[in-house]
Amino acid sequence: MKKTLFVLLCLLISLTAARGGDKITTTNPERLPVQARKFLSEHFSDTRISIIKIEPKGSATTYDVLMENGVAVAFNHKGMWTEMDAKVGSVPQSAIPADILQYARDRFPGCEVQAAKRDGKNTEIKL
């Protein structure tokens, strides 16, 4: 009985460890949710996709897209952006909610948005 339980436990651990490396790397935008493709075509129409990393996390898959201009965009399983980070340059102004962008322009003239993060209704930007 102990031996059978031990074998089953080892099998379970090995299967769990094997599933940990299910990341997919591609450059095909068709692998993204429709909402994510729409967002990228609206706000990054002049920039091509460098790489897409798809990471299944239970029932919620996440998508990390690196654009050729150095901006990284993370999407949730529904295709809604959750993070944008510009290593060089800035995040496209059109991608930032208008009220937040106007607030930043009024208080910090001349600054550009370097990163943005949102969860639900809250959006945070880094200038």
Residue ranges of each PLM-predicted region?
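Amphipathic N-proximal alpha-helical interface segments
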Residues: 61-88, 127
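Short, non-transmembrane alpha-helical segments in secretory-pathway proteins
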Residues: 27-49, 91-113
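Positively charged n-region of N-terminal signal peptides that target proteins for export
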Residues: 1-4
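Hydrophobic h-region of N-terminal signal peptides that target proteins for export
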Residues: 10-18
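Catalytic strand-loop segment that frames the active site of acyl-thioester-processing enzymes
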Residues: 7
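Boundary of Sec targeting at the N-terminus
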Residues: 18-22, 40
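A cross-family detector of function-defining hotspots
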Residues: 48-67, 112-127
